[in-house]
Amino acid sequence: MRFSRFIIGLTSCIAFSVQAANVDEYITQLPAGANLALMVQKVGASAPAIDYHSQQMALPASTQKVITALAALIQLGPDFRFTTTLETKGNVENGVLKGDLVARFGADPTLKRQDIRNMVATLKKSGVTQIDGNVLIDTSIFASHDKAPGWPWNDMTQCFSAPPAAAIVDRNCFSVSLYSAPKPGDMAFIRVASYYPVTMFSQVRTLPRGSAEAQYCELDVVPGDLNRFTLTGCLPQRSEPLPLAFAVQDGASYAGAILKDELKQAGITWSGTLLRQTQVNEPGTVVASKQSAPLHDLLKIMLKKSDNMIADTVFRMIGHARFNVPGTWRAGSDAVRQILRQQAGVDIGNTIIADGSGLSRHNLIAPATMMQVLQYIAQHDNELNFISMLPLAGYDGSLQYRAGLHQAGVDGKVSAKTGSLQGVYNLAGFITTASGQRMAFVQYLSGYAVEPADQRNRRIPLVRFESRLYKDIYQNN
């Protein structure tokens, strides 16, 4: 009996040694200095098929969205909807609303200006033509900063990093056109569509075509209060305008200006002022409302397209719903940790969760922890309907054109979430092997860097690495 146990143990050691040797061969495809933590395990199995630094902490990047989605489904449920309302505690007399109009924003990441227009139209149809009171922008569902700890400061004005505020309209992103001046040395000028309630100032100097100075004189944007932006730097002369897009920094101010304009366009006047309401108040009578699509539909978009805005509003909403407090980053983090431990049996230990999207550089997680999450998802997928929300290699989302997986011949066989930051290329999800087995895998690859001269072909080593790795996983399990 002891001898048989010794043989089994020896066989396991040999297997793991072979695994490590094989993984080391894959790593030779990567740029020098790259760090890999990898874990592959059959769904329902007690031991991994590949365990390579699975306890090593790493930046999850957008694989964090897998955790956010699971916690959201458990806490909020697949049918949850974000709700935006127009409310009042006043009465309507002869077309005059005697009291304040409250626009209660519920952090709907999909709310559009047209939705606000429709709600105002409903208000008008109810007989209101004048408001004898103030217009309040209620953002009390969230509190504290709208930007998570650890977000790179230079990404703050990019639309993919738009602050997930309580008040969001058209993803809190706006577009402008930058025109070079006819004469070199003069300031370029900016055109902003009138329906964007923002102010842009140009301090951009126009350079002659082909100017050597353009290489190091870059465009930059400096945000100010109340969605005022200053564009600085240089722009070589060009015949066509340069299209640019920026993230709104003050969601409440932006939404308030849009509501103010829509009331004006509808012919509804008011005697008071536009104010922000941040303290929780008793709701009034709802006169108009807009609901988002069901949560499951939003999570599918979030996972397929790696939508940061949805991820972070959902994350903050989880904290709000779990603890009945305004949604903050800390509340979201504590709620996710508690939900996974108490309702999914997943103890994430010393994992650091700073946001829901994975944009924060403060996030840290080990592949072994993410593997626990994936195993729970796979074993409860009948009720969660989760795996179908993940990008499918070769077909949709962020895996549609993943060259390494295509070369590995696993199009349609891999459902996984991608995660990319500077020097980070992650994957976490599932592969159906040639024998029909479903295996979960976590690939955390960081420290990926190439020489400046090789930037154009920087992904070639990644393609080689992933094509060999996933081809072997597919064929040999």
PLM regions: where:
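Bacterial N-terminal signal peptides that target proteins for export
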Residues: M1-I7
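Bacterial N-terminal signal peptides
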Residues: I7-A15
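Beta-lactamase-like hydrolase cores
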Residues: V18-M57, T83, R117-S126
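Short active-site loop at a secondary-structure junction
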Residues: D51-A71
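Small-residue-rich helix-loop
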Residues: A49-D51, K112, F315-N477
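Generic beta-strand/beta-sheet core signal
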Residues: Q41, T232, T273, A354, ...
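Conserved serine DD-peptidase/penicillin-binding transpeptidase domain
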Residues: N22-I27, Q75-I348, R468, D472-N476
